[in-house]
From Swiss-Prot:
GO aspect biological process, one term: glycyl-tRNA aminoacylation
Gene coding for it: glyQ
Record protein name field: Glycine--tRNA ligase alpha subunit
GO CC terms: cytosol
A GO molecular-function descriptor: glycine-tRNA ligase activity
Annotated TM spans: none
InterPro entries, sorted: aa-tRNA-synth_II/BPL/LPL (IPR045864), Gly-tRNA-synth_heterodimer (IPR006194), Gly-tRNA_ligase_asu (IPR002310)
Length: 314
């Protein structure tokens, strides 16, 4: 167990994971500052997995899934939660051993605990991404998803990116031996203990109320359409009208376009929580997002190719 950090707190566990993966060569970057449903949507994964340039990043990512809210009444279902993401390209041959080393650092000796890799291939329809993968079960509870990316944005991943996604709340609940996420000790310092509930319970109550009851459906439909239009404009797929004139971007801007797609996707997720989209419509919206993501992937690849894939020269 890492003696530098108190892994029996949520805060200390995150610091220990950051320190461990930094020692393995990962650059520790900060969370993406927009609403995403998973750590995979961070540009350091979703875009950097495209093309031949090597990378190694690790980061915490706050993630939002509006339909998973339970008004703060469920001990392990949240509409806002945390993932710890590790992405390395090309995926090292010993990435599973590195992962097991991180568990050992957190106090889980593989010879003393039941750690299983259960095949579970991964797919993200809106990202146009899929990969070969495994769930990692620790003493009967899923705590991590392991994925070898095969495609992102419809583009084949060459070389393959290895991704490790820790479910931080689940892992912490096991380490701390609590049955409710709200009882987790977030920090324990000179001013006393702060629990997960102290930090986030009210947020879960209020955000669940908004997601399910008060999110403005007409406004969200309008947001989706506007973000889609803006993304198409930034990808040079269609012009914008200004003062009765067509305006075109000179060069596609895949990074700002991707941010508009994430905004559209979050609007869609809120509409889903409000049950404003039928099953048939749901598939159509997913395909609209996927088409935009494909455009971003192609534009991002082209932009890096035009630069001569500078990451390959280091």
């Amino acid at each position: 167990m890492d003696a530098k950090f108190n892994v029996k707190t949520f805060q200390g566990m995150i610091l220990a994971l950051q320190d461990y993966w930094a020692q393995q060569g990962c650059t520790i970057v900060q969370p993406f500052d927009m609403e995403v449903g998973a750590g995979t949507s961070h540009p350091m994964t979703a875009l950097r997995a495209i093309g031949p340039e090597p990378m190694a990043f690790a980061y915490v990512q706050p993630s939002r899934r509006p339909t998973d809210g339970r008004y703060g009444e469920n001990p392990n279902r949240l509409q806002h939660y945390y993932q710890f993401q590790v992405v390395i390209k090309p995926s090292p041959d010993n990435i599973q051993e590195l992962y097991l080393g991180s568990l050992k650092m957190l106090g889980f000796d593989p010879t003393q605990h039941d750690i299983r890799f259960v095949e579970d291939n991964w797919e993200n329809p809106t990202l146009g991404a899929w990969g070969l993968g495994w769930e990692v079960w620790l003493n009967g509870m899923e705590v991590t998803q392991f994925t070898y990316f095969q495609q992102v944005g419809g583009l084949e991943c060459k070389p393959v990116t290895g991704e490790v996604t820790y479910g931080l709340e689940r892992l912490a609940m096991y380490i701390q031996g609590v049955d409710s996420v709200y009882d987790l000790v977030w920090s324990d310092g000179p001013l006393g203990k702060t629990t997960y509930g102290d930090v986030f319970h009210q947020n879960e109550v209020e955000q669940s109320t908004y997601n399910f009851e008060y999110a403005d459906v007409d406004f969200l439909f309008e947001c989706f359409n506007k973000y889609e239009q803006e993304a198409k404009f930034l990808l040079k797929q269609e012009p914008r009208m200004e003062n009765d004139k067509e305006i075109w971007v000179e060069t596609a801007l895949p990074l700002p376009a991707y941010e508009r797609i994430l905004k559209a996707a979050h609007s869609f997720n809120l509409l889903d929580a409000r049950k404003a989209i039928s099953v048939t419509e749901r598939q159509r919206y997913i395909l609209r997002i996927r088409a935009l993501t494909k455009g971003v992937a192609e534009a991002y690849y082209a932009s890096r190719e035009a630069l001569g894939f500078p990451g390959c020269k280091k």
